[in-house]
Curated annotation (Swiss-Prot):
The lineage of its organism: Eukaryota, Fungi, Dikarya, Ascomycota, Saccharomycotina. One of its GO terms (molecular function) is translation initiation factor activity. Its main location: cytoplasm. One of its GO terms (biological process) is cytoplasmic translational initiation. This is Eukaryotic translation initiation factor 3 subunit I. Belongs to the eIF-3 subunit I family. Coiled coil: none annotated. It comes from the Eukaryota.
């Protein structure tokens, strides 16, 4: 499984995102460049220029007509994917840490950071997947954390845009109504005092995976907020994703970036780890990065995955046939019956 190494950023990666078909991979980092890559060979299609600060989030609408980004310049922007030009921007009081289109592409979540005395929160905008359309300037709803809850760290849509699932800095998950923004429920998923470091939905958006500094990744059902599975590791995790074709989850992390100069890559545990989604066993690791993995993302068709590191490199791995042939004995026996 030879990786394709992508060099387009000078600073640590913050998020990777495939479009719905998976032919394009978008990357953002703590620099001003937003890169667009062909996922099958790693060729750079182009860059989106104009951001005024580090970029923390990126997402393409379902038709891959427009792209949304969130940045430290306190803006959320919409871009024309064909020309690379900004077509709209919304200004906020603090850094925009997360953007995500709804499954039908008509709404956009924008999550702003709590800092400098501003509470932050989630704004939901109506958007039009038309580069010539005039976008609405005001959100259709604003969501703030419940009283006593910690700040929002991440937010994703559930299936059909029914819920907005949010992750918090205290290790908890919350659920809000996707149409009204009304609070529904909250639960403690990870250990308290250990922040959630990533939140990604399953391919069908019926459950989510979270990673945390408590050295675990966990699956949670979006309807009940019930904990389904726990994947235990020996180092803090920065990211986790769910593969679509095989029953695996991929975890990425490693020793904190501030400590990496004192350790080798082996001691730092800078590997992508594969766990069986059902049995919770670790089944393999992929090395290559020489710093912590900041983000991992699975290709929509399940044939590859990409990882982004603290060192600024992206690695795309296309799976070998042996990956698809691997099964547990119980899976083989069940298939024969």
């Amino acid at each position: 499984m030879r990786p394709i190494l992508l060099q387009g950023h000078e600073r640590p990666l913050t998020q990777l995102k495939y479009n719905r078909e998976g032919d394009l991979l978008f990357s953002v980092a703590r620099d001003k460049t937003i890169c667009v890559w062909y996922s099958h060979n790693g060729e750079r299609l182009g860059t989106l220029e104009g951001s005024g600060g580090a970029n923390f989030s990126v997402d393409a609408d379902p038709t891959t007509t427009i792209v949304a980004t969130g940045s430290a310049d306190q803006t959320a922007r919409l871009w024309d994917i064909k020309t690379g030009k900004t077509i709209h921007s919304w200004n906020f009081k603090t850094t925009v840490k997360r953007v995500e289109f709804s499954p039908d592409g008509t709404k956009l979540i924008v999550l702003s950071e709590k800092m400098m005395g501003y509470p932050g929160g989630i704004s939901v905008f109506n958007v039009k997947a038309d580069v010539n359309a005039t976008q609405e300037t005001e959100p259709i709803m604003d969501i703030k954390p419940e009283e006593g809850a910690d700040k929002f760290s991440f937010a994703v849509w559930s299936y059909g845009g029914k819920y907005i699932i949010t992750a918090h800095a205290d290790g908890s998950l919350s659920k809000y109504d996707g149409a009204t923004g009304e609070f529904i429920a909250s639960t403690q998923i990870h250990e308290e005092k250990f922040p959630i470091t990533d939140l990604q939905p399953s391919p069908d958006k019926t459950y989510v995976i979270t990673s945390s500094k408590d050295k675990t990744a966990r699956l949670t059902d979006v309807d009940s907020l019930k904990l389904l599975k726990t994947y235990k590791t020996d180092t803090s995790m920065n990211s986790a994703c769910i593969t679509s074709k095989k029953d695996f989850v991929i975890l990425g992390g490693g020793q904190d970036a501030k400590d990496v100069t004192t350790t080798s890559s082996r001691d730092g545990k800078f590997e992508a780890r594969f766990y069986h989604k059902i049995f919770e066993d670790e089944v393999g690791r992929v090395k290559g990065h020489f710093g912590p993995l900041n983000c991992v993302v699975a290709h929509p068709n399940g044939g590859s995955y990409a990882s982004g590191g603290e060192e600024g490199y992206i690695r795309i791995h296309h799976f070998d046939p042996s990956y698809f042939d691997f099964t547990y004995d119980v899976e083989r026996f069940a298939a024969k019956e």
